[in-house]
């Protein structure tokens, strides 16, 4: 070993005089998120917040039509009703309104319902334009294929209802 390396290592080993530890003690500092969390907890404690249990999800509707979604079970909600304060903990996700539609219809206010109608109209016009473009660019063959795809959603008639009605009346006469 070089004397330089040895001197460097020795200088790191002893950092003080007599009676001091020979190794450097690495102090673990409080991370900034823990420090912020402690400050937040202290501020909320001053407001007198109480935890609210049974919250499955929290949705905040933005003006641009998107939704800030906090999903369970990671959501913690604390409230101080006299000071009109709610604190929501957990990772939030920005989602489109259409992604959450079936589950949040009862949560929508008048503004959000207007946004939903606007989105539905734009979606309908978009699908109509796509169908027209496919029919126009593909010729008659593409149009027929498009009609066949649309028929998948509508069930085919199996029986004739007039004949079924006649059979039913015949059964009633026999009884």
UniProtKB/Swiss-Prot annotation:
Which InterPro entries is this protein grouped with? BTF3, NAC_A/B_dom_sf, Nas_poly-pep-assoc_cplx_dom
Coiled-coil annotation: which residues?
none
Name of protein? Nascent polypeptide-associated complex subunit beta
Any one GO CC term of this protein is: cytosol
Q: Which UniProt keywords apply?
A: Cytoplasm, Nucleus, Protein transport, Repressor, Transcription, Transcription regulation, Transport
* Top-rank lineage group of the source organism: Eukaryota
| Start and end residues of each NAC-A/B domain | 34-101
Which terms under GO biological process does the entry name? protein transport
Q: What does this protein do?
A: Component of the nascent polypeptide-associated complex (NAC), a dynamic component of the ribosomal exit tunnel, protecting the emerging polypeptides from interaction with other cytoplasmic proteins to ensure appropriate nascent protein targeting. The NAC complex also promotes mitochondrial protein import by enhancing productive ribosome interactions with the outer mitochondrial membrane and blocks the inappropriate interaction of ribosomes translating non-secretory nascent polypeptides with translocation sites in the membrane of the endoplasmic reticulum.
The scientific name of the source species is Cryptococcus neoformans var. neoformans serotype D (strain JEC21 / ATCC MYA-565) (Filobasidiella neoformans)
Q: Where is the composition biased (Basic and acidic residues)?
A: 164-175
**Self-association and partners:** Part of the nascent polypeptide-associated complex (NAC), consisting of EGD2 and EGD1. NAC associates with ribosomes via EGD1.
Instruction: Name any one Pfam family assigned in the record.
Output: NAC
Q: Which PROSITE patterns match?
A: NAC_AB
Q: Where is the composition biased (Acidic residues)?
A: 149-163
State the residue spans of region: Disordered.
Answer: 1-36, 129-175
The compartments listed are: Cytoplasm; Nucleus
CDD domains in the cross-refs: NAC_BTF3 (cd22055)
Q: Which family does it belong to?
A: Belongs to the NAC-beta family.
């Amino acid at each position: 070993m070089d004397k330089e390396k040895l001197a460097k290592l020795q200088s790191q080993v002893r950092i003080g005089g007599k009676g001091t530890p020979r190794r450097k003690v690495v102090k673990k500092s409080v991370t900034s998120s823990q420090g912020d969390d402690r400050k937040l907890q202290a501020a909320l404690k001053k407001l007198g917040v109480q935890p609210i249990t049974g919250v499955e999800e929290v949705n905040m509707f933005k003006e641009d039509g998107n939704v800030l979604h906090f999903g369970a079970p990671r959501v913690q909600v604390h409230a101080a009703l006299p000071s009109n304060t709610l604190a929501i903990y957990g990772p939030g996700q920005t989602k489109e309104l259409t992604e959450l539609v079936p589950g949040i219809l009862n949560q929508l206010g008048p503004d959000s319902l207007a946004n939903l109608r606007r989105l539905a109209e734009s979606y309908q016009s978009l699908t109509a334009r796509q169908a027209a473009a496919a029919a126009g660019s593909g010729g008659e063959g593409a149009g027929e294929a498009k009609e066949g795809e649309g028929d998948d959603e509508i069930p085919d008639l199996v029986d004739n209802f007039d004949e079924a009605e006649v059979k039913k009346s015949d059964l009633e006469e026999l009884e």
